[in-house]
Amino acid sequence: MNVKTVKCPSCGKPVPWVPESRYRPFCSERCKQIDLGAWAAEQYTIPVVEEDDLPDAPGNDTSGKLN
């Protein structure tokens, strides 16, 4: 059987993608905690698109006028 592997997001070590891999996608509890700490310290961010930057779409009129 060919087992798929993924790289641990913290250290890059290969991790077999099977139910027995307790911390997947991480290789260990330590790498899992390092990643959680990075999120808690706001080292990772999710990009936000400002509403002014969104293209105009039909039905998205925010002027308050009714058609």
Curated annotation (Swiss-Prot):
GO terms for biological process: regulation of DNA-templated transcription. Binds 1 zinc ion. This is DNA gyrase inhibitor YacG. One of its GO terms (molecular function) is zinc ion binding. Its cofactor is Zn(2+). Zn(2+) binds at C8, C11, C27, C31. InterPro entries: DNA_gyrase_inhibitor_YacG, Znf_NHR/GATA. Keywords: Metal-binding, Zinc.
